[in-house]
Amino acid sequence: RSLLDISVSIGGRFVQEQRSAIYSRIDRGSTVRISDVAVLPKADALLELSERVISSFTVQIYSGEEVLLSREYDLELMAFDQWLGTQILPQCLASFVVPNQPAVGRMVVKASALLKQMTGASAFVEYQDGDPNTVVEQVSAIFAALHQEGIIYRAVPASYEAIGQRITLADQVLESYQGNCIELTLLMASVLEAVGINSGVVIMRGHAFLGVWLSEVCYRQSICDDASFLEKACSDGIS
């Protein structure tokens, strides 16, 4: 039989409630693509998550106000600080580089004072003078500033690079004075980005560390699994 006044709704604890436009008639055997509803998260609810949660959302098909069909779909949600590792969207690691945090800004100020002691100039000019040594001096000042914080190193979880881990953000690392290799790497990357210096996070089995571009270039893609690329970039005469 033909269906009259058809609409679709979607909603759940972590999914925004939506309802499609009404289709006055859908003939038997015909197909209709409904594009004005989507699985959209409730951002505020997601930010409140502190642990992994298994939830669901419901899709219902109406004829007028009569429910013709109701289906529930499982939804696995992670806390906002969960990184899923290198096997699932590894490029999402970049979202944990947070150059605009106030704590990162304070580290820039501290590093600026150290840079003045080292070079006589306190300004972070990133790549403006075209001299790789200037970049090295700026990176050294930032490293020295972070080193003076006395942050304690703690080990990463086993196989973290494959299965991921909870990431302590830069401000929390500075507040708690502790972090593992990936968190310290992201902290350093955050401060570098705040002053305009390009960096890259290198992930190895059981470890992570930072690489810095000494000239104003960067890799065109967000991820690279070719070790020879790094080897060539680190060769003598290449910045």
PLM segments and residue spans:
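Short beta-strand elements
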Residues: 65-100
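Secondary-structure boundary elements
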Residues: 104-176
